[in-house]
Amino acid sequence: MTITRRDLMKASIAAGTALAIPSVLRAQSGLAGPRTVRMVMGADLSVFDPIFSTAGITAYHGLAIYDTLFSLDSKFMPQPQMVGKWGVSEDKKTYTFELRDGLSWHDATPVTAADCVASIRRWSQVNSGGKLLMERIRDISKKDDKTFTIELKEPLGLLIDLLASVSTPVLFIMRAKDADRPATEQVTANIGSGPYKFNHDLAKPGASFAYDRNEKYAPRGEASDGYAGGKVVNVDRIIWDNIGDEQTAFAALQAGEVDFVEGPPVDLYPVIESDPNLALQVLDKSGYDMCLRMNFLQKPFDNVKARQAMLHLIDQEALLRVTAPDPKYGRPVTSIFGNTTPYSNDENTGWFKKGGNPEMARQLFKEAGYAGEKVVILQPANIAWIRDAAQLLAATLRKIGVNAELAPSDWGGLVKRRANKGPVESGGWSIFITNDSDYLQGDPTSAIFLNASGEKAWFGWPKNDEYEALRAKWPDVGTLEERKDLARKMQGIWWDFVGDVRLGQFAQPIARSKALTGIIEMPQLVAMWNMQKA
């Protein structure tokens, strides 16, 4: 019998033996009292501008320090957040918004309507829903310091939904002097109006970041409800500790050095469940859809046959055994609209086969003219499920004669490299794996995966004009049944040109100390208000 390092680790943990804790945590353990929460997120924060980047960790940062005009409640209905009052004209073309009282920036200056106008304009440069909004806008303008209007060329019933969407990049409101710069240039000030203030003095890039309670933040009067309602902060400080090794992060949790681990090792779920001081908690009940993004701009995936090869190659069940070995947390997904949305369907899914179809994939690569070009797969070493999925994918590609090469880095390095549109010889890439909330796949106007507008689309830059013409109809379709019909047509085209490849769906619980309660259960983002620590 072969005993692996992981087997030994599980045995030592089950016996109550703490693993070595990073010295930085031992030295700072006095900080983790009841008024301080220490969290290990699933990735290191390397990009701070939540409009510049769609990375989830950057959006979490944005949710802490910025605020939003509208927010989704627990039933996914948009509710006013920074907005105090709003109304729409009889012809449904002019919306008027008035900010609520008590809004101020962390530098003590007041939030104004001009900040909101600039922020909407910047966000709309990069968010799919925002781009749709700008296509319909006649004008967006400040009326006075607290009031602004959006005038439309034609009615857009989804307008408030778009402003409240949690599809990244989220519409976080920034100071006008920050939001006036193009979305392609990073904002570095980290000054928002949200419930937490970024502590610049305690920032240790690559090691830890601290967020302090904004004592001047005035939450709404309503009870907290999803991302909506009053954002009440019950602790003085949140510290994000960057612990790249998942086993070490878990050991720190078990030893009480941290309170929250976003991505605990899947094979340690039973250990966590049996620990009287720890709990697993699923924050996104809809789950996450794993997605393989291919670079449409470079060989071999500029050829549709090569993309179709990937569709046939993938064995979702094998990937799920790696990423979600407990079947209660994982299942296949074949619809671009996910498993849990009203628009999930089986149109054009004949390619799906238990175990995949490697021989068909080999033939399609041959028809694509594949000639041994290097296929570079970006692999984040600090996100276990993506790391392991990339490892399995590379091995599967090599078995059918594809020259697959892994490019390991941390998640921050992957985020930077995936923006490179050049060939692999110039630091580009061929494939990376990521995920998005299944819930978000029900809105193709905002879902980053479902945009196929070429170089204006999300990383991978899929392009198909026929599909995009159908997607453009989505906001104006009146009934649920009509949208379901449109969804089938869109999916039929998508799986022909293969805008991406879905790898399966999983629910990813966080691990926390039982002393930490009140964590908001919503898709996509981790909110840090409402938490309490005993």
Where are the language model's segments positioned?
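Ligand-site clamp/hinge motif
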Residues: P219-V271, N403
